[in-house]
Amino acid sequence: MSGIGNKRAAGEPGTSMPPEKKTAVEDSGTTVETIKLGGVSSTEELDIRTLQSKNRKLAEMLDQRQAIEDELREHIEKLERRQATDDASLLIVNRYWSQFDENIRIILKRYDLDQGLGDLLTERKALVVPEPEPDSDSNQERKDDRERGDGQEPAFSFLATLASSSSEEMESQLQERVESSRRAVSQIVTVYDKLQEKVDLLSRKLNSGDNLIVEEAVQELNSFLAQENVRLQELTDLLQEKHHTMSQEFCKLQGKVETAESRVSVLESMIDDLQWDIDKIRKREQRLNRHLAEVLERVNSKGYKVYGAGSSLYGGTITINARKFEEMNAELEENKELAQNRHCELEKLRQDFEEVTTQNEKLKVELRSAVEEVVKETPEYRCMQSQFSVLYNESLQLKAHLDEARTLLHGTRGTHQRQVELIERDEVSLHKKLRTEVIQLEDTLAQVRKEYEMLRIEFEQTLAANEQAGPINREMRHLISSLQNHNHQLKGEVLRYKRKLREAQSDLNKTRLRSGSALLQSQSSTEDPKDEPTELKQDSEDLATHSSALKASQEDEVKSKRDEEERERERREKEREREREREKEKEREREKQKLKESEKERDSVKDKEKGKHDDGRKKEAEIIKQLKIELKKAQESQKEMKLLLDMYRSAPKEQRDKVQLMAAEKKSKAELEDLRQRLKDLEDKEKKENKKMADEDALRKIRAVEEQIEYLQKKLAMAKQEEEALLSEMDVTGQAFEDMQEQNIRLMQQLREKDDANFKLMSERIKSNQIHKLLKEEKEELADQVLTLKTQVDAQLQVVRKLEEKEHLLQSNIGTGEKELGLRTQALEMNKRKAMEAAQLADDLKAQLELAQKKLHDFQDEIVENSVTKEKDLFNFKRAQEDISRLRRKLETTKKPDNVPKCDEILMEEIKDYKARLTCPCCNMRKKDAVLTKCFHVFCFECVKTRYDTRQRKCPKCNAAFGANDFHRIYIG
């Protein structure tokens, strides 16, 4: 511990050691060691040789001294680190020990009922650590055990006393402190035992049956608790006050610590600069020593002669002037002085650093042990004290209200418990009902599952039966589809016939309208038979197509299972349709030719029969009557077709094909009757025209008409034959169709029976599913009812809780309102006035405090800046003085008249100057071979590379930053 206060004493021998060594080395060099000087011609040469040897020895001694200094410095740094760690550990132990003692003291005052709180106040003063002495290094201090009894005695730092005392005194003091902490712990144990005895006595009195003893015990306990409450309240006030003062002091000391740290950083930067300068000077000195040693070795080895005033070269001899040696010695002395000055500056900076660290530690100690009495004098503390007294009175009132509320709470709890018991009983009964219903539903569900299994088995059996009857059904469906295709083809042919009929009717109407005169009646009679044969031709073609379609249908029924034959049949039908279209085109061309001929005849007859215009009008009236009759017939046929369509729509699918065939047969018969009627009409017209016309032209026309009639009669006979063939084919197809229908009816009956069985199974399955769904719905409804009952119970419980809370709130509000109304109304006006005044004062004080704090911070910043600038100016001033003294010496040497050099000396000086310019200013050893492209300063490549690698990427002369691409080599020839 003696090393804590004696840091400077340890550092002083380090400064005084090197000079002693120097003298010792000099003495040894002059007395002990023998020097071989070689051949000497004069006393001056002898002096020069001796000086050279001394200089060499001095350089060696300087190197030894520097090595010793480095070792000592490292040793001192290690000791300082060790001492700092020891001090830190001691400070931590002392801090926690003092905190332990303080906590024990507070606990004793908390539980020691015999002493008052005034003793604690005196003890608290003793706990405060004052400002440490200037020669102490401790961060936290502690009072001795003697200071506990007497709080007004001056308090000394425990660590400072330990540092100033001997080892025996240290042991005795530490033993005393340990004994004091032991005594404090034993006191805590005794106090705890007393409290335990008192509690046991009170519990015995309370457990005894006598009412008087119980009342006494309760009164005693109340008084004890009231005293304890008062003591605790005072203790909390004291601790809060202490915390407040400590926080304020902490803020102040934190600012001081920040300023000290900034100063320390400035000093550290200055120390680094000085260390850099010292290293630079040392390197220069070493370089000079090496150079001097090399020169001396050359002189000794080659036997160069040295003359006092000569400066020329004589056949292998080099003349060295004695003045140069003097100059070199003077430079060496200057460098030594510079080194001593730098060393002194470093020592001063180290002392300043130590002082700053001690101040920093003192400030930390002050921060941890701030004065607590200042808080009591502040208006904020007084205001808080008054507010605390008001709040304490209010707390007493609230306690009374709380007792009343507790009584009400016990009553409401009893009622609430009764209600809860009733609700629980209802819930248990509902649970029982629900269980019975759930059991019933499960039984019904099991029955439904059994029925479902039975139905599933039956359904599988029916499916197997249906799979057996599957191929028969497929064959029937295939036959039905083929018949449907045949029916579709017949429908297409019927539609085609209808279209042809309409075209024929439209052509008829056109031809009848064209016959405009009576003279053209004969022509029209000739034209009608021309048209009729075309119509007959078309009808015969239609009948032929109809018969071919029937034949194709029979082939389809026979060969329905063969797809290749169907394709051939389609191909044949397409070929037939193409042939029919070709025939129709040929017939149209013939009709066109006939129409052209008839038009020519009309043109020739029109000129002759203009006079017979009146007869033509009568014939036109007859033609109109005939057209009206035909219109009526067409309307009747339309009605018949509508009836057939209705019958076809109302008929089932099995009979639709039959209906189509019957309709086609009726239609063909009606067309035959129409054709016969037309034939009769034409014959009648022919007879009438034969009677009327006797001319040669009429005879020619009659002959032509007769030819046409013969042609038509032949065609009619052909049509009759085809009709008879078609009727026979129709009978055959009808019989085949009836057979197929009977088979279809049988198969349909079988299908219906199977469908009925399937429908029965499906209906039973649907019924079972419906029953299952109903049971599920009933179960869900019961679950919903249970949930609703639970939610109702929860809601009732919440309502009860809310009502209880409302009761508590209302009762507390009523009690507090009645008691506080009177007091609050009286104190409200006074408090308002005081609050307004206090708020105004607080605002003013806050504004003043903020302004003062701002000014203080500004002043502190300015002081720090001024101190930094002053230190920098002093440093620059010292450097400038050193430069001035060095330059003065040079000036004095240059002003001397005896020192006027000769030409060789001037040349040598110039060479030296050029060499100095070409050598790197950083290391002063290597040549300049690298340039910085940012500022164009020249150095050696090794120095620039080391600066770049060590991240000191600034120019040594102008501090301009440079990067990897901002320097390169140059070659000076």
Swiss-Prot record:
Positions of post-translational N6-acetyllysine modification: 21, 348, 510
GO molecular function, one term: transcription coactivator activity
Gene3D superfamilies: 1.20.1170.10, Zinc/RING finger domain, C3HC4 (zinc finger)
Residue pairs linked by disulfide bridges in the UniProt entry: none
GO cellular component, as recorded: HULC complex; nucleolus; nucleoplasm
Residues in coiled coil: 43-90, 168-378, 429-896
Modified residue annotations for Phosphoserine: 41, 136, 138, 522, 560
Swiss-Prot/TrEMBL GO biological process terms: negative regulation of cell migration; positive regulation of transcription by RNA polymerase II; protein polyubiquitination; ubiquitin-dependent protein catabolic process
Top EC class of this enzyme: transferase
Presence of keyword Coiled coil: yes
InterPro entries, per database record: E3_ubiquit_lig_Bre1, Znf_C3HC4_RING-type, Znf_RING, Znf_RING/FYVE/PHD, Znf_RING_CS
Region annotation Disordered: where it falls in the sequence: 1-37, 128-153, 507-620
Protein location: Nucleus
Entries under SMART domains matching the protein: RING
UniProt keywords, alphabetically: Acetylation, Chromatin regulator, Coiled coil, Metal-binding, Nucleus, Phosphoprotein, Transferase, Ubl conjugation pathway, Zinc, Zinc-finger
EC number: 2.3.2.27
Zinc finger (RING-type) in chain: 920-959
Subcellular location, principal: nucleus
Pathway given in the UniProt record: Protein modification; protein ubiquitination
Basic and acidic residues biased stretches: 139-151, 527-544, 553-620
PANTHER family: E3 UBIQUITIN-PROTEIN LIGASE BRE1A (PTHR23163:SF2), RING FINGER PROTEIN-RELATED (PTHR23163)
Similarity comment: Belongs to the BRE1 family.
Purpose: Component of the RNF20/40 E3 ubiquitin-protein ligase complex that mediates monoubiquitination of 'Lys-120' of histone H2B (H2BK120ub1). H2BK120ub1 gives a specific tag for epigenetic transcriptional activation and is also prerequisite for histone H3 'Lys-4' and 'Lys-79' methylation (H3K4me and H3K79me, respectively). It thereby plays a central role in histone code and gene regulation. The RNF20/40 complex forms a H2B ubiquitin ligase complex in cooperation with the E2 enzyme UBE2A or UBE2B; reports about the cooperation with UBE2E1/UBCH are contradictory.
Subunit record text: Component of the RNF20/40 complex (also known as BRE1 complex) probably composed of 2 copies of RNF20/BRE1A and 2 copies of RNF40/BRE1B. Interacts with UBE2E1/UBCH6. Interacts with p53/TP53 and WAC. Interacts with PAF1; the interaction mediates the association of the PAF1 and RNF20/40 complexes which is a prerequsite for recruitment of UBE2A/B. Interacts with PA2G4. Interacts with FBXL19.
Protein name: E3 ubiquitin-protein ligase BRE1A
Species name: Mus musculus (Mouse)
